[in-house]
C-alpha cells in the first residue's frame, strides 16, 4: 500500500498536523478566526513591504521623494503603498480583537501561548513605530523624536541610551537608516514568534466559548475551519482593498504629506490611531518617568492576567458581572483612543486621567474581585 505523503513526509507532516488533521473544538465561533486573519495580515505586509523596499531609499534627503516616486511612477506603486499603510491598521484591528477574545474566554490560561502573544504584540508595535518613521514626513520625524525621547526618562542611563538609539544628538540620517533596517528585520522575527505561538497552542489545543475541555468532541480543522477561515480572509481583504482604493488616507495624518522639518513643530503631535490609547495613558501622568512607566504598564499588564484569574470558571460566558466589567473596559479603551487624539486641554486632561485610572483598576482589581464574588454567588 502506498504511503500517504501528507502524513509521512517530514515537512508535509508538520503542515498536516497544524492545518489539516488538527483536532479542533466543534463549537468555536468567529472570534477564533482572528488568529488566521493575523497570519494573512503578516503575509500581506511582508509581500507589499518587500515590493516597497525595492523602491525606497533610506536617506533623509531622498526618503520622502522616493515614496512620492513610488506613488507616481512605479506600476501600481500607489496601490502597494496604500495596501501596506492600511494593512497595518487591519493588523492592529485583528490583534486587538484577538486579545479581547482571549480575555473574554479565558484563553490566557494557556500561559505560554498567551505570553508569546503579548511579546508578539510588543514586537508588532515596535515594527509599526519604526515603519511610520520611514516616509520622513513631519509626523514621522516628530513622532520619532517624541517617542524615542521617552527613553531619556530612564534614570542614569536614559540620555546615553537615547543618543545611542539616534546615532547622534538628534533624529537624523543614522536614525532613519537603522529604523529601515529594523523595519525590514522585525516582521521576520514576528514570523518566528508566530511559529512558537502556534507550537505552544497545538500543545494544549484551542480553547472554546464554553471554556471547558473539549477532547471528547473534536473535529478535523480541514474542511470545517479552512472554509470558515477563507470566508474571513475574503471579508477582511475586501475591506482592506476597499479602504486602500476609496479612502486610503482616512486613517493617516495630513501632516505627513509635508516633508520632515526639524525647525517647525506640528501643532498636535500624535501617533497613528492604534497607539492612541497608550499615548493617552502616557499623557495623563504629569511626570515624565511616571508617564513612561504607565505607558509600559498599559501593555505589560497583559502578562499579569493569568495570575489574576480567581474564577473557577474559565470563560466569561456564564459570568455576568465579569461581562459587564469586560465591556466597560472595551468602552474605556475606546474613550482613551479618542482622548489621545485630542489636544492637551480641559476637559480632555481629566477625562484621560479618569480613563487611565479605570483601565488599570478594572484589569488589576475589579476583574479578580468580581470573579471571586461570582464564585460565591454561583456556590462554586
Swiss-Prot record:
Chain positions recorded as heme b b562 binding sites: 84, 183
Role description: Component of the ubiquinol-cytochrome c reductase complex (complex III or cytochrome b-c1 complex) that is part of the mitochondrial respiratory chain. The b-c1 complex mediates electron transfer from ubiquinol to cytochrome c. Contributes to the generation of a proton gradient across the mitochondrial membrane that is then used for ATP synthesis.
Bound cofactor: record note: Binds 2 heme b groups non-covalently.
Regions crossing the membrane: 34-54, 78-99, 114-134, 179-199, 227-247, 289-309, 321-341, 348-368
SUPFAM superfamilies according to UniProt: a domain/subunit of cytochrome bc1 complex (Ubiquinol-cytochrome c reductase), Transmembrane di-heme cytochromes
Other comments on record: Heme 1 (or BL or b562) is low-potential and absorbs at about 562 nm, and heme 2 (or BH or b566) is high-potential and absorbs at about 566 nm.
The keyword Ribosomal protein is annotated on this UniProt entry: no
Membrane protein topology class: Multi-pass membrane protein
Binding site for a ubiquinone: 202
Keywords, in A-Z order: Electron transport, Heme, Iron, Membrane, Metal-binding, Mitochondrion, Mitochondrion inner membrane, Respiratory chain, Transmembrane, Transmembrane helix, Transport, Ubiquinone
Swiss-Prot/TrEMBL cofactor(s): heme b
Main localization category: mitochondrion
CDD domains per UniProt: cytochrome_b_C (cd00290), Cytochrome_b_N (cd00284)
GO cellular component: mitochondrial inner membrane; respiratory chain complex III
GO terms under biological process: mitochondrial electron transport, ubiquinol to cytochrome c
Binding site for heme b b566: 98, 197
Name the UniProt record assigns to this protein: Cytochrome b
Subcellular location: Mitochondrion inner membrane
Record family assignment: Belongs to the cytochrome b family.
Subunit structure: The cytochrome bc1 complex contains 11 subunits: 3 respiratory subunits (MT-CYB, CYC1 and UQCRFS1), 2 core proteins (UQCRC1 and UQCRC2) and 6 low-molecular weight proteins (UQCRH/QCR6, UQCRB/QCR7, UQCRQ/QCR8, UQCR10/QCR9, UQCR11/QCR10 and a cleavage product of UQCRFS1). This cytochrome bc1 complex then forms a dimer.
Amino acid at each position: 500500500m502506498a504511503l500517504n505523503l501528507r502524513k509521512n513526509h517530514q515537512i508535509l507532516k508538520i503542515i498536516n498536523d497544524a492545518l489539516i488533521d488538527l483536532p479542533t473544538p466543534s463549537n468555536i465561533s468567529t472570534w477564533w478566526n482572528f488568529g488566521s486573519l493575523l497570519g494573512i495580515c503578516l503575509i500581506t505586509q511582508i509581500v507589499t513591504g518587500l515590493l516597497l523596499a525595492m523602491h525606497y531609499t533610506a536617506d533623509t534627503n531622498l526618503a520622502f521623494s522616493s515614496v512620492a516616486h513610488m506613488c507616481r511612477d512605479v506600476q501600481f506603486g500607489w496601490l502597494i503603498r496604500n495596501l501596506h499603510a492600511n494593512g497595518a491598521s487591519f493588523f492592529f484591528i485583528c490583534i486587538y480583537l484577538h486579545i479581547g477574545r482571549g480575555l473574554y474566554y479565558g484563553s490566557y490560561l494557556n500561559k505560554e501561548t498567551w505570553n508569546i502573544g503579548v511579546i508578539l504584540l510588543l514586537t508588532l508595535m515596535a515594527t509599526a513605530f519604526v515603519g511610520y518613521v520611514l516616509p520622513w514626513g513631519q509626523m514621522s520625524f516628530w513622532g520619532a523624536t517624541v517617542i524615542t525621547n521617552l527613553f531619556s526618562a530612564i534614570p542614569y542611563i536614559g540620555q546615553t541610551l537615547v543618543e545611542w538609539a539616534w546615532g547622534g544628538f538628534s533624529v537624523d540620517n543614522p536614525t532613519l537608516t537603522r529604523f529601515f533596517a529594523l523595519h525590514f528585520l522585525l516582521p521576520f522575527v514576528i514570523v518566528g514568534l508566530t511559529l512558537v505561538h502556534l507550537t505552544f497552542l497545538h500543545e494544549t489545543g484551542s480553547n472554546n466559548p464554553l471554556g471547558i475541555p473539549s477532547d471528547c468532541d473534536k473535529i478535523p480543522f480541514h474542511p470545517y475551519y479552512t472554509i470558515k477561515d477563507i470566508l474571513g480572509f475574503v471579508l477582511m481583504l475586501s475591506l482592506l482593498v476597499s479602504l486602500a482604493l476609496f479612502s486610503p488616507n482616512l486613517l493617516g495624518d495630513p501632516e505627513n504629506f509635508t516633508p520632515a522639518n526639524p525647525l517647525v513643530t506640528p501643532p498636535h503631535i500624535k501617533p497613528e490611531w492604534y497607539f492612541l490609547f497608550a499615548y493617552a495613558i502616557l499623557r495623563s501622568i504629569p511626570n515624565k518617568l511616571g508617564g513612561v512607566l504607565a505607558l509600559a504598564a498599559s501593555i505589560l499588564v497583559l502578562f499579569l492576567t493569568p495570575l489574576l484569574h480567581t474564577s473557577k470558571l474559565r470563560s466569561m460566558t456564564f459570568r455576568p458581572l465579569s461581562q459587564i466589567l469586560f465591556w466597560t473596559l472595551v468602552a474605556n479603551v475606546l474613550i482613551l483612543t479618542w482622548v489621545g487624539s485630542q489636544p492637551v486641554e480641559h476637559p480632555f486632561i481629566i477625562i484621560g486621567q479618569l480613563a487611565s485610572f479605570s483601565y488599570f483598576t478594572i484589569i488589576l482589581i475589579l476583574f479578580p474581585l468580581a470573579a471571586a464574588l461570582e464564585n460565591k454567588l454561583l456556590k462554586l
